[in-house]
A protein has these predicted regions:
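Non-catalytic alpha-helical scaffolds and adjoining flexible linkers that form interface surfaces
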Residues: 1-21, 25-216
Length: 216
């Protein structure tokens, strides 16, 4: 059995002295794991977390771990490594993908959003880009946030609150009786973290430490 796609290398774990078990977020097949031969000893084009490239995965049976062939096209993480704050955002995104996405289920839209995030993490727009990426992650996992209109009356102005139950915006008038129960807009990482906690609880996992360390 052979699968081919493009992907982002999001994890490497040593396997013996030469090989590694790689985790790749592919556009067509989602998160996949497999053995990457010679990953630890390669002197040219050494596999590194944060690379994007072409991958093929081979196994006799679909249930097997299988092996990867990986051709890196670009190391997206290189410009990020010099900034501790941007590196923290990268680590959080990788860990969230690893923990929350089921293996071998395609999330093509989120894959594209992740590529956009990797590009943006090397710029001054990294914080906003990361917040937008978390919103995309929540949406693709079935927890879409709707900030377009008030969930109570349909108003499109004065949307300064968010319902923790529905993830929908609430205008000032409708929010008045429930101020203490609502999240304040605009969105911050503190608010998206609360929704991510719900997702993690539903999946029986905990929010990654790298995500908990991010500041608001």
């Amino acid at each position: 059995m052979k699968l081919e796609s493009v992907g982002i290398l999001i994890g490497l774990r040593p396997m013996g002295e030469r090989d590694s078990v790689a985790r790749i977020f592919s556009r067509d097949f989602g998160v996949m794991c497999g053995v990457l031969r010679g990953a630890q000893t390669a002197r040219v084009n050494r596999p590194l977390v944060g690379q994007i490239g072409a991958m093929s995965w081979n196994a006799r049976l679909e249930s097997q771990l299988g092996t990867f062939h990986w051709e890196s096209a670009r190391n997206m993480a290189a410009p990020i490594m010099m900034s501790g704050a941007r590196l923290a955002l990268l680590n959080s995104a990788i860990d969230l993908v690893t923990v929350l996405l089921p293996e071998r289920e395609a999330y093509a839209h989120l894959y594209d959003e992740t590529l956009n995030l990797l590009d943006a993490l090397g710029t001054d727009n990294s914080g906003v880009a990361y917040l937008n990426w978390e919103i995309a992650l929540l949406r693709d996992l079935g927890y879409a946030l709707d900030l377009s209109h008030c969930s109570g009356c349909g108003a499109r102005t004065n949307l300064n609150y968010l319902s923790p139950r529905t993830g929908r915006a609430v205008c000032d008038n409708c929010a008045a009786p429930y101020i203490g129960r609502l999240y304040k807009l605009p969105l911050t990482l503190d608010v998206t973290a609360r929704f991510l906690d719900v997702v993690c609880a539903d999946q029986g996992v905990t929010l990654p430490v790298s995500r908990r360390r991010l500041t608001v």
